[in-house]
Swiss-Prot record:
InterPro entries documented for this protein: Ribosome_maturation_RimP (IPR003728), RimP_N (IPR028989), RimP_N_sf (IPR035956)
Pfam family, one: RimP_N
Keyword Cytoplasm tagged: yes
Gene name, Swiss-Prot/TrEMBL: rimP
Upper classification of the organism: Bacteria, Bacillati, Actinomycetota, Actinomycetes, Acidothermales
Record protein name field: Ribosome maturation factor RimP
Subcellular location: Cytoplasm
Role played: Required for maturation of 30S ribosomal subunits.
Similarity-based family: Belongs to the RimP family.
Length: 170
């Protein structure tokens, strides 16, 4: 079962360790089992994170966890499994940095006045995102093609979701 208090404190402790690797800490999950713990850490950066960066972050995090008394107290006297990964395509776009990393990508998002749309992220400035809306879903679930540019506050949209695009071959 996840322990949110322990995970929150571990996130606070690990954020500088991850930042020291040039990465952003995107999530920490601590799953308690009877005889062990499973710690999931999600990291990212602008331009995406590479496998060797994940490996370096994993080593730095492991070293920290093995040598920090507070982290040791949270995890407890049992063994733990450390899993460090990138967020993956299914991560919701919530923070401005998430939207910035999605510039040029197609996303599904819910707008306050239009409802669900599929749009291309064109730009992010501060807490605003400029979208090129390509498809809008109607109340009966039909998908209608439309093009409209719109700038909206990130706080006003429900979390966005990146849409997978496939290349069309002639």
């Amino acid at each position: 079962m996840p322990t949110s208090t322990g995970a929150q404190r571990l996130a606070e402790l690990l954020a500088p360790v991850v930042a020291g690797q040039g990465l952003d800490l995107e999530g920490v999950t601590l799953l308690d089992h009877r005889t062990s713990a499973h710690l999931r850490i999600v990291v990212d950066k602008d331009g995406g994170v590479q496998l060797d960066e994940i490996a370096a972050a994993s080593q730095a995090i492991s070293h920290f966890l093995d040598n920090d008394a507070e982290a040791d107290a949270i995890i407890g006297p049992r063994s733990y499994t450390l899993e460090v990964s990138s967020p993956g395509i299914d991560r919701p776009l919530v923070e401005p940095r998430h939207w910035r990393r999605a510039i040029g990508r197609l996303v599904r998002v819910q707008l306050p006045d239009l409802g669900p749309v599929v749009a291309r992220v064109q730009d992010v400035t501060g807490d605003q995102v400029r979208l090129g809306i390509e498809w809008q879903y109607t109340d009966d679930g039909a998908c209608v093609r439309q093009y409209e540019e719109r700038t909206v506050a990130i706080a006003e949209v429900r979390p966005g979701q990146i849409e997978v695009e496939f290349e069309e071959h002639p």
